[in-house]
Curated annotation (Swiss-Prot):
Role of this protein: Site-specific tyrosine recombinase, which acts by catalyzing the cutting and rejoining of the recombining DNA molecules. The XerC-XerD complex is essential to convert dimers of the bacterial chromosome into monomers to permit their segregation at cell division. It also contributes to the segregational stability of plasmids.
Classification via Pfam families: Phage_int_SAM_1, Phage_integrase
GO BP: cell division; chromosome segregation; DNA transposition
Protein name in the entry: Tyrosine recombinase XerC
Stored SUPFAM superfamilies: DNA breaking-rejoining enzymes
Domain Core-binding (CB): 2-88
Record NCBIfam families: PRK00283.1, recomb_XerA_Arch, recomb_XerC
Lineage: Bacteria, Bacillati, Bacillota, Bacilli, Bacillales
Family recorded in the similarity comment: Belongs to the 'phage' integrase family. XerC subfamily.
Cellular component GO terms held in the UniProt record: cytoplasm
GO molecular function: DNA binding; tyrosine-based site-specific recombinase activity
Gene giving rise to this polypeptide: xerC
Primary subcellular site in the record, as a coarse category: cytoplasm
Active site, per annotation: R149, K173, H247, R250, H273, Y282 (o-(3'-phospho-dna)-tyrosine intermediate)
UniProt signal peptide: none
Natural source organism: Bacillus pumilus (strain SAFR-032)
Amino acid sequence: MTNKQRLVHLFIEYLQIEKNYSALTISGYTEAIEEFVRFMNVQGIDGFEEVSYQDTRIYLTEAYEKGLTRRTISKKVSALRSFYKFLLREQLVKENPFLLVSLPKQDKRIPSFLYEEELKELFTVSDVSTPLGQRNQAILELLYATGMRVSELCSLKESDLDLSMDTVLVHGKGSKQRYVPFGSYAHEALITYLEDGRLKLKAKGKDRADAYVFLNQRGAPLTDRGVRFILTELMKKASGTLHIHPHMLRHTFATHLLNEGADLRSVQELLGHSNLSSTQVYTHVSKDSLRKTYMSHHPRAFKRS
């Protein structure tokens, strides 16, 4: 193991043990740092302490020339800045060359979401007479009812569900927990799945799956990739013209709440956002909702007799 690899390994351990970051987040950090190490090797830079501000500018220029988006570059810079902050704390370097690097200004993207008519169609495609269909229906209902992330859904255990109060304890990023309520549709879908479909799926698996709510066809805990595949297949059945991604039901949850008058702070808490700015991206509304509001409230929207 080279000295560079040793320092990267120490940083990854720090993210796992002290910061308690998710595997997905750590993977992103690792990829960014390893890519930068390859850049250092090409440039003939032996150690992290030798990297200068000018080197970081060359690195960024190459990233732009590769056609990377500003969002991707911003994530890489953020990861490297955190890495050097760790090295400084451990007194392994004397300065952070990424501290003066300005993060690229990102385009504000409006999250994609489903209209109510599209949701209704999506909720009718699962064959709820089968264990997998019952599971899929419970996944759809719970994702839309709570706005939780797919990774949070996959980590749910039976002890996290309170069906008497219709609430779920969600284990979010950075070991943060939050209670989120859900409605009658999600309640009914969960009851059907837990009392029938899940028992049949569990019988095919091993003891390690006992605690997890959502299981695959072999009785093992369902993964993020598994949920992504399920959502894609369900959307194909509902409408071949639409593409659904794992976060779309979360976007839809937030958008529909705000469109119906929920306050931003409450939605922030339900989503588990640490910053309000992360929630504000959902303040877009549909054209129909905008038109309805305009026609209802603008004094000169139409002539009154």
